[in-house]
């Protein structure tokens, strides 16, 4: 899978999910905290730049292997 660059639109820490806006302008992608790579607290900040892959989830496309850049 190719890595896609994007920016965090919003992320709700208490609920553990949010959305990423891909840099290519395509539709926002759902992200769950379990898809965030790294140690410690798995959260994202609004406006943070990330790289990710897209996988089909239960409710449509979802980001996986999310890393901050």
From Swiss-Prot:
Compartments where located: Cytoplasm
Gene3D superfamilies listed in its UniProt record: Nucleic acid-binding proteins
SUPFAM superfamilies per UniProt: Nucleic acid-binding proteins
Keywords, in A-Z order: Activator, Cytoplasm, DNA-binding, Transcription, Transcription regulation
Gene Ontology MF term list: DNA binding
Record domain CSD: where: 6-66
InterPro entries: Cold_shock_CspA, Cold_shock_domain, CSD, CSD_CS, CSP_DNA-bd, NA-bd_OB-fold
GO CC annotations, alphabetized: cytosol
Principal subcellular localisation of the protein: cytoplasm
UniProt-recorded name of the protein: Cold shock-like protein CspC
Species assigned in the record: Shigella flexneri
Native organism taxonomy: Bacteria, Pseudomonadati, Pseudomonadota, Gammaproteobacteria, Enterobacterales
């Amino acid at each position: 899978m190719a890595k896609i660059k994007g920016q965090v639109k919003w992320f709700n820490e208490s609920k553990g999910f949010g959305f990423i806006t891909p840099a290519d302008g395509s539709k926002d992608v759902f992200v769950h905290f379990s898809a965030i790579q790294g140690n410690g607290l798995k959260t994202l900040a609004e406006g943070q730049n990330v790289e990710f892959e897209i996988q089909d989830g239960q409710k449509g496309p979802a980001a996986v292997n999310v890393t901050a850049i």
